UniProtKB/Swiss-Prot annotation:
Catalyzes the formation of 5-methyl-uridine at position 1939 (m5U1939) in 23S rRNA. PROSITE patterns: SAM_MT_RNA_M5U, TRAM, TRMA_1, TRMA_2. It catalyses: uridine(1939) in 23S rRNA + S-adenosyl-L-methionine = 5-methyluridine(1939) in 23S rRNA + S-adenosyl-L-homocysteine + H(+). S-adenosyl-L-methionine binds at residues 278, 307, 312, 328, 355, 375. Disulfide bonds: none annotated. The lineage of its organism: Bacteria, Pseudomonadati, Pseudomonadota, Gammaproteobacteria, Alteromonadales. Belongs to the class I-like SAM-binding methyltransferase superfamily. RNA M5U methyltransferase family. RlmD subfamily. The active site is at residue 401. It comes from Shewanella piezotolerans (strain WP3 / JCM 13877). This is 23S rRNA (uracil(1939)-C(5))-methyltransferase RlmD. [4Fe-4S] cluster binds at residues 83, 89, 92, 171.
């Protein structure tokens, strides 16, 4: 059974009397929308078509927020959450909605945001890229919290919009081998004498094994290190310690870097604890395949890949024979991408470190750009898109993890003579409101 620990007490809020409201739709964050006294009311956990009993928890000039107390009339799309920690853990927020409806809602939200802010619609809305809705995450970061009174360390995920840690026994969206480790890891950590020095725990299921990276704020005793090493060896784990300077030390395992590969390639994309990778392996494979298909790079073309990371898109694009220039803002990832390209024997791809908020058109290594791919963080790539008029690629694939920033950046792209020809929702994170998306822009004629 889940135990709920609070890092600090929350300030109590004045609740309204109980209200019965009719939910009409979902917002793009997955909250139900109802109306009361002329204002929109956002209700987490409520679904369209439902009558729900709520209490108002926050009242602003134009909207209110409410706590769901009871579903009086349930939607036919409502299902029972599979996770026993669902109502407390902040990791998932749509398990109460069947997966088909989740995907339909996300696709609709994406199209509405782009239409609203970019004042356009795609010529073609492509099929949603998706796979299994459960046990899909190959990587997760678990939080820890040490209770000074009980001397117990909790291992789990943060509660929604809170620093509180919800101790969990399993996770239904985490890969099964990783989920099975959680209770044993929690027990192990509580046997250590240096519990107060433990930070987060990063779990990764790579192609070459399971990696457990334990963040520590100070050196552990030899006895604690031995316990960790023995646990790692007995469970065939690659157990590593990481200090505050991001230095890592291997305690057990083969000592190699984790890597993943694509089904149609022998290339190994190696990565380190601090490197970003997509957590959903099968959907990432489909997304990369679609990006290559949309751009259709030719052997005589030059392709620019911005925010290239460790080469997730760059290496598959380079397999076509095109020259690929990958640009990344994190030096360590540029170095890793270069190593990955060399290991794959791809000699027409090169990687550079640059400030991606600056104008790249004058960089001596850039030259002519025929096609372009961009995969920015949640903040988007507003500054990079302003330089399109100088680069003038014939086609641009924009991969986004935030539909709001995609919508904003689309407006900039369209103003520079491009048309939005294709768009697709990418269900990278089932059971949550989060989504990836892909858009193809082509230079107008």
């Amino acid at each position: 059974m889940a135990q709920f620990f609070k890092a600090k007490p929350n300030r109590s809020k004045q609740l309204s009397s109980k209200l019965s409201l009719n939910v009409t739709q979902l917002d793009h964050l997955g909250a139900g929308i109802a109306h009361h006294q002329g204002k929109i009311v956002f209700i987490n956990g409520a679904l369209p078509g439902e009558t729900v009993q709520v209490q108002l928890t926050e009242q602003k000039k134009k909207f209110s927020r409410a706590k769901l107390l009871k579903v009086e009339t349930a939607s036919g799309e409502r299902v029972s959450p599979l996770c026993i920690h669902y109502e407390k853990c902040g990791g998932c927020d749509l398990q109460h909605l069947n997966v088909e409806s989740q995907r339909a809602h996300k696709a609709k939200a994406l199209q509405e945001l782009v239409a609203k802010f970019a004042q356009t619609t795609a010529s073609q809305v492509c099929e949603t890229l998706s796979d299994s809705p459960w046990h899909y995450r190959r990587r997760a970061r678990l939080a820890t919290w040490f209770d000074k009174k009980t001397k117990h360390i909790s291992l789990g995920f943060r509660a929604s919009s809170s620093s509180d840690v919800v101790e969990i026994q399993s996770c239904v969206v985490l890969a099964k081998p990783l989920s099975a480790l959680i209770p044993e890891l929690a027990f192990l950590l509580n046997q250590l004498s240096g519990k107060k020095a433990l930070g987060h725990v990063e779990l990764t299921l790579a192609d070459n094994g399971i990696f457990v990276v334990l963040r520590v704020t100070k050196a552990l005793s030899d006895k604690d290190r031995q316990r960790l090493a023995e646990f790692g060896a007995s469970h065939s784990l690659n157990m590593l310690l990481q200090d505050d300077d991001a230095n890592t030390e291997s305690l057990s395992g083969h000592g190699q870097q984790p890597f993943y590969s694509f089904n149609d390639s022998d290339a190994e994309l190696k990565f380190s604890a601090g490197n970003f990778i997509q957590v959903n392996a099968s959907v990432n494979q489909a997304m990369v395949n679609q990006a290559v298909d949309w751009l259709a790079p030719q052997a005589n073309e030059r392709v620019l890949d911005l925010f290239c990371g460790i080469g997730n898109f760059s290496l598959p694009l380079a397999k076509s024979g095109a020259e690929v220039i990958g640009v990344e803002g994190v030096p360590a990832m540029v170095e890793q991408a270069t190593v990955n390209a060399k290991g794959a024997a791809l000699d027409k791809v090169s990687f550079y470190h640059a400030d991606l908020s600056a104008d790249l058109s004058q960089q001596p290594w850039l030259g002519k750009v025929d096609k372009m791919l961009i995969d920015p963080a949640r903040a988007g790539a507003y500054e990079s898109m302003l330089s399109l008029k100088k680069l003038k690629p014939q086609a641009l694939v924009y991969v986004s993890c935030n539909p709001a920033s995609l919508a904003r950046d689309s407006e900039v792209i369209l103003k520079q003579g491009y048309r939005l020809t294709k768009i697709a929702m990418v269900d990278m994170f089932p059971q949550t409101h989060h989504l990836e998306s892909m858009a193809l822009f082509e230079l107008g004629k």
